């Protein structure tokens, strides 16, 4: 429903809630097959279903992901405030943490971030009259039209409520799973853990950041990130691995079931559309 607010603001007619849900869950299911395949599929699905420009739909999808990126940034800041000691422990204890700390503080990274868009802009200007650059510019403008609806769409308040609601549910998945294992229950009752909210936040943020690494639904990077996070609270590697594997496996099963439902829904919708066109 959140994405639907953007789509309508971009001039795309209201989509049935079931169809919109199918596009989301189908995307998650396809991401289990190949990284980011689901994102491409859901844009193509909506563009074909509503007979609209694909680049406009892609722009709304980028806006949707930008909203999630803002939420992750806010969660990182919150984690640095309430769990700074555990983050410092990760950066000091593990080679990965030391490498990450060096990577983010190295001036080369920031020089690249500054120079990359300048180089792209210069190259685009030099070759501005070529058909390739003109086509790219046209597609980028359509994507910007889809993305920019975030700043002037109706229902902004509801969009924000949906965004916070989605991420609260994501967090609760991680937090409630603590109750399922004896070795994580003490994180809920332990002193200084705020009823498990601090460990839950650290594990959740580590897992969320790992999703930026291309993978099949997070398999691998997400598990490693969760194991690292749990180890900061004294959970052994074997127990932490069990937590991450069981958690990920149940999520994958739910997504696969949702994907199967989505496939049947699309198949039946197309059949009904063909029958309707034949009658006409």
Place the predicted regions along the sequence by residue.
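Extended non-transmembrane interhelical loops and adjacent amphipathic helices
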Residues: 3-11, 21-51
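Alpha-helical transmembrane segments and their lipid-water interface positions
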Residues: 3, 31-42, 68-79, 215, ...
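Short amphipathic alpha-helical coupling elements at transmembrane boundaries
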Residues: 8, 12, 44-48, 55, ...
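Predominantly cytoplasmic-facing regulatory/coupling regions of multi-pass membrane proteins
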Residues: 1-25, 82-208, 250-280
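Re-entrant/interfacial helical elements at transmembrane boundaries that shape
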Residues: 37-48, 215-232
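Transmembrane alpha-helix interface/packing and boundary motifs in multi-pass membrane proteins
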Residues: 26-35, 202-223
């Amino acid at each position: 429903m959140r994405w639907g607010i953007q789509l309508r603001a971009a001039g795309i007619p209201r989509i049935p809630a079931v169809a919109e849900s199918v596009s989301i869950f189908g995307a998650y299911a396809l991401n289990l097959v190949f990284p980011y395949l689901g994102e491409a599929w859901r844009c193509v699905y909506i563009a074909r279903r509503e007979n609209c420009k694909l680049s406009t739909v892609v722009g709304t999808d980028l806006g949707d992901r930008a909203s999630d990126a803002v939420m992750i940034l806010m969660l990182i800041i919150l984690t640095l405030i309430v769990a700074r000691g555990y983050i410092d422990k990760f950066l000091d204890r593990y080679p990965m943490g030391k490498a990450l700390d060096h990577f983010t503080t190295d001036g080369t990274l920031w020089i690249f971030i500054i120079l990359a868009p300048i180089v792209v802009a210069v190259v685009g200007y030099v070759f501005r009259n070529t058909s390739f650059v003109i086509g790219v510019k046209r597609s980028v403008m359509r994507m910007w039209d889809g993305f920019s609806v975030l700043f002037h769409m109706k229902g902004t308040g509801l969009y924000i409520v949906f965004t916070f609601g989605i991420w609260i549910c994501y967090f609760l998945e991680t937090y409630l799973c603590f109750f399922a294992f004896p070795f994580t229950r003490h994180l809920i009752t332990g002193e200084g853990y705020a009823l498990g909210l601090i460990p839950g936040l650290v594990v959740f943020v580590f897992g969320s950041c790992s999703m930026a690494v291309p993978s099949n639904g997070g398999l691998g990077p997400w598990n490693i990130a969760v194991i690292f996070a749990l180890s900061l609270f004294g959970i052994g590697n074997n127990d932490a691995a069990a937590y991450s594997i069981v958690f990920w496996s149940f999520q994958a099963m739910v997504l696969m079931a949702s994907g199967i439902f989505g496939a049947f829904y699309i198949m039946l919708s197309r059949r009904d559309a063909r029958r309707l066109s034949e009658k006409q």
